[in-house]
Curated annotation (Swiss-Prot):
GO molecular function: protein-disulfide reductase activity
Residue intervals of the CHCH domain: 61-105
Biological process terms in GO annotation: mitochondrial disulfide relay system; mitochondrial respiratory chain complex assembly; protein import into mitochondrial intermembrane space
Organism of origin: Bos taurus
Protein known as: Mitochondrial intermembrane space import and assembly protein 40
Organism superkingdom: Eukaryota
Short name of one Pfam family: CHCH
Record motif Cx9C motif 1, residues: 64-74
Function: Central component of a redox-sensitive mitochondrial intermembrane space import machinery which is required for the biogenesis of respiratory chain complexes. Functions as a chaperone and catalyzes the formation of disulfide bonds in substrate proteins, such as COX17, COX19, MICU1 and COA7. Required for the import and folding of small cysteine-containing proteins (small Tim) in the mitochondrial intermembrane space (IMS). Required for the import of COA7 in the IMS. Precursor proteins to be imported into the IMS are translocated in their reduced form into the mitochondria.
Sequence ranges of Acidic residues compositional bias: 106-116
Length: 137
């Protein structure tokens, strides 16, 4: 026996093997051009955040999704002169969560930190200090 269940905007239909043996008489519903979740980008027309936007790269639905949503929402709705300056705690919580999942959220390494410091200026100053010490002796 088939039945249908509504979950939010989705309708889930459960069918039996017998239901599949007969041709479907289901009517397809045309896309709603006013659907607030369809192709509006990150910010919906009413100013809310579209958490389904592919531009978020799944960040809103991963293991740190709630922390991401809290930080991003705080930043989006921030009224501070330095936008988001009141969101430090939320971003810190998101960062702490992401550090627990390094495979899912790899940290970008800055090239400057990977490069060893240039040893030439230090060697040059040591050489001139040695020359000065030798000259004064």
């Amino acid at each position: 026996m088939a039945y249908c269940r509504q979950e939010g905007k989705d309708r889930i239909i459960f069918v039996t093997k017998e239901d599949h043996e007969t041709p479907s008489n289901a009517e397809l519903v045309a896309d709603d051009p006013n659907d607030p979740y369809e192709e509006h980008g990150l910010i919906l027309p009413n100013g809310d955040i579209n958490w389904n936007c592919p531009c978020l790269g799944g960040m809103a639905s991963g293991p740190c999704g709630e922390q991401f949503k809290a930080a991003f929402s705080c930043f989006h709705y921030s009224k501070e002169d330095v936008k988001g300056s009141d969101c430090v705690d939320q971003f810190r919580a998101m960062q702490e969560c992401m550090q627990k999942y390094p495979d899912l959220y790899p940290q970008e390494e800055e090239e400057e930190e990977e490069q060893p410091a240039d040893p030439l200026p230090e060697a040059a100053s040591e050489a001139s200090a040695t020359k000065e010490a030798a000259a004064s002796s």
